Every structure is written in structure tokens, then in C-alpha cells.
Amino acid sequence: QNSNWFPIAAINYVADLLEMPRIRAYEVATFYTMYNLAPVGENLIQICTTTPCALRGSKDIVDVCKKRLNINFGETTSDNKFTLLEVECLGACVNAPVAWIGDEYYEDLSKESMDSIIDQLKKGDLKLSPGSQIGRNGSMPMGQRNSLLDEGK
């Protein structure tokens, strides 16, 4: 409703409305990564870099974003099209590495899939479906049994 961010005045308003100390509302607003306290770009890319994602290659995903967008974490492109943020666990560890773009999770990312996502976002036409980028259904194991009777791949 406010281009993915809200000002301190909004936090104060909510705290006053709920008759709670303003610091309590501020604590909530600064704890969760879905709340931004400063303007962000049209395309907000948040990349998880905690241990499971790091072990599965999130550094490569970060490198692609930084190189393609020519920005670092916490920065917005000069045309205000992209903001890149580093975030803590997004809760999709089994499908790591994960990026949260807009309102969707993109999972099982590779350098190539992230590069394609950025290309599509730059054109304003994101065609890739959210979720696993390698065709996994939910969090099923890769190449292993999916049930007791399954032979695996």
C-alpha cells in the first residue's frame, strides 16, 4: 500500500491506536524482514544467506545479483527498479538457496535461474513460476524415494 515500506509515523500511529509503548511497535517493525522502514525499489529481492542456503550456494546467487544490478546489500538501483537485501532464514531451508522476490519465494536457485529472473524483471515480465526452479514438488527429496514404494530416480 505504501510501495513496500512505512514511515516511523505509521509505527507511532499503530502504537498509539493500540495504546502500547511506541518502542514495542518499533521492535516488531524492525524484527521482521517483511517490514521496510525506508523506501525500496520496485523489485525487492531478499536473499537468505544463513547456513542451509549458504551450504547450497546462496553466495553464487548473491554474486549474480550484485554483478547484474551493480548494487550491494541494502542498496537500491539509481532507476529505483531494484533493492537487494540480505535476510535471515526464510523458512524454506529444504529448497535452498531461496530468494524472496516481491510476494513470492523462488527456491532451488542456481546462478542461471537467478540470472534469468533478473533478466525478466528488467523487462517487466517475470514468467518464471515461484517455488522450486528445478521442478521439485514441495520439499520432496531430489532423486530419492518419495514414498515407501517409490524406487527413486
Q: Locations of the language-model features?
A:
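Signature of N-terminal electron-transfer/Fe-S-associated modules in redox systems
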Residues: 1-153
